[in-house]
Amino acid sequence: MSKTFDLGVLYSRSGTYQLLSEALFTGAMSAIESVNANHDLPVSFNPIVRDPAGELTNYAPMCAEILSSSNAKHVVGCVTSSSRKEVIPELDRAQATLWYNVPYEGFETSARVVYSHAATNQNILPLLGWATRHFGMSVYLVGSNYIWGWETCRVMRTRLEAADGSVLGERYLPLGDTSVESLIEDIEKSRPKFILNSLVGASSYAFIKAYAELGQRDPYFASDNCPLLSCNLTEAELPVLGNAAEGLISVGPSFRKNPTSNGEGSSLERTAFQSVLTLAEALAHGASGPFDSYLAQHGARYGIDPATQHKSLDVHIAQVRNSAFKILHSWSDIAPDPYLTRPSRHPKFSDPMLKVVQA
């Protein structure tokens, strides 16, 4: 007989990062439907859905309400690192687990979180290594003004400067800010070899569109010469970007060659889907009590590192061509290293670092 488990679903259906949330929500709910339709599984899920509407202050109380008003011990949710950090105290109090399905900046482990998407050595490092080999050693850093933007740019800056590269500019915008004119002007003056875009949601879309216009005015900023790079752009956001997305370079655990108009098949959707299936399998195998104790013994079965509760992932660098991602470089099964203390887990390049000759 199937046992039904309450499962929290905590994604914003509106707000500046709505497209990301919608992809994650779709993946999670599709997986719940799949589990419930699979009569060979001895478990099913009752989703307890809450919508924080993109407001940071809503996450902790809504997470607490899920955990106190139901029997849920697992929550699939959160997009920003700020929201993830907001809910961890509530998870601690309830001995519950968050399945976090978004790329993030690393430098965190929590017994209350399964980090299912890319960490620092699975996104920032391979992207930087690839970009410096193909475009050069000077970068302009752009990010949203919270921990994701700060830490992504910090790691990029530290690594690049250690390799005798240079950061020509570093700017941050509040979440949702779409005033990018002065930012574009500064980039135009600085003329870097590439730009790392760590903006999120509406800010990112405004910046990408403005940069595409700059590339039309000045061939130096064409995508084949001075590209925009991202650690978090997926198929879920391509429809809203239209032609402005052409030439963008991103990194992720998977890309779909022919995404549908609604972003179906993005790594966000697939990661959320897989997290729910993994949880169902773990519960079917008798997982009970604090989930970190179960992962300490059985995490490797699911590709989860018991020491950090991060997943091993494939890593792909891809570029948007004709409204779809084309994979440029890949690594298989990269183990997580969120604190960047295990160089053996960092993606390697078979070619030596290119020496860029300045005219």
PLM region descriptions:
Residues L24, N38-G106:
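Beta-alpha junction/loop-to-helix N-cap segments that form part of ligand/metal-binding clefts
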Residues V49-L56, V102-P103, S116-L125, G143-C153, ...:
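Hinge/beta->alpha junction and helix N-cap segments in small-molecule ligand-binding domains
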Residues K73-G165, F221, P227-L241:
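Extracytoplasmic ligand/sensor domains, especially the bilobed periplasmic-binding protein
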Residues T4, G8-M29, R50-G54:
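Extracytoplasmic "Venus flytrap"
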Residues Y211-L277:
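Extracellular/periplasmic periplasmic-binding protein-like sensory domains
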Residues N38-G54, S110-R112, L160-D177:
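Short beta-strand elements in bilobed, periplasmic/extracellular small-molecule ligand-binding domains
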Residues S81-E86, E188-D218:
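Hydrophobic alpha-helical
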Residues G265-E269, A280-K348, V356-Q358:
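Segments of small-molecule ligand-sensing domains
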